[in-house]
């Protein structure tokens, strides 16, 4: 279910402050965040965020196509080891 339009997009308050500080600072600085639930806003375009995946921070460079999505969509939490190989096919 989508979020109501009258509520607007959800963004943690500290995230806006960090984004403003990153705009004034150096360009290659990674802003570490733990808020995977926050929506990416147009003012975040061009900033690299380090989105926490439960283990480490994954660098995510925000582009215009990402606006409206959540930060958690770009930082996978699980690693896929691949399907187990068939033992019969492996012996041949």
Curated annotation (Swiss-Prot):
Q: Which Pfam families match?
A: Ribosomal_S19 (PF00203)
GO biological process terms, alphabetically, are: ribosomal small subunit assembly; translation
Q: Which GO terms describe its cellular component?
A: cytoplasm; small ribosomal subunit
Q: Which UniProt keywords apply?
A: Ribonucleoprotein, Ribosomal protein, RNA-binding, rRNA-binding
Keyword Ribosomal protein listed? The answer is yes
Q: Which InterPro entries match?
A: Ribosomal_uS19 (IPR002222), Ribosomal_uS19_bac-type (IPR005732), Ribosomal_uS19_CS (IPR020934), Ribosomal_uS19_SF (IPR023575)
Gene Ontology terms for molecular function: rRNA binding; structural constituent of ribosome
Concerning SUPFAM superfamilies, the annotation shows:
Ribosomal protein S19
Q: Which family does it belong to?
A: Belongs to the universal ribosomal protein uS19 family.
Function text: Protein S19 forms a complex with S13 that binds strongly to the 16S ribosomal RNA.
Q: What is this protein identified as?
A: Small ribosomal subunit protein uS19
Which organism does this record belong to? Methylorubrum extorquens (strain PA1)
Q: Which classification does the entry list for the species?
A: Bacteria, Pseudomonadati, Pseudomonadota, Alphaproteobacteria, Hyphomicrobiales
């Amino acid at each position: 279910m989508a979020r109501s339009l009258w509520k607007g997009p959800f963004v943690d308050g500290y995230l806006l402050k960090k984004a403003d500080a990153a705009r004034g600072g150096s360009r290659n600085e990674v802003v570490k965040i733990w808020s995977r639930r926050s929506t990416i806003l147009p003012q975040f375009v061009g900033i690299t965020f380090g989105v926490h995946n439960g283990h480490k921070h994954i660098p995510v460079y925000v582009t215009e196509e990402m606006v409206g999505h959540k930060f958690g969509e770009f930082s996978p939490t699980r690693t896929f080891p691949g399907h187990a190989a068939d033992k019969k096919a492996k012996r041949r």
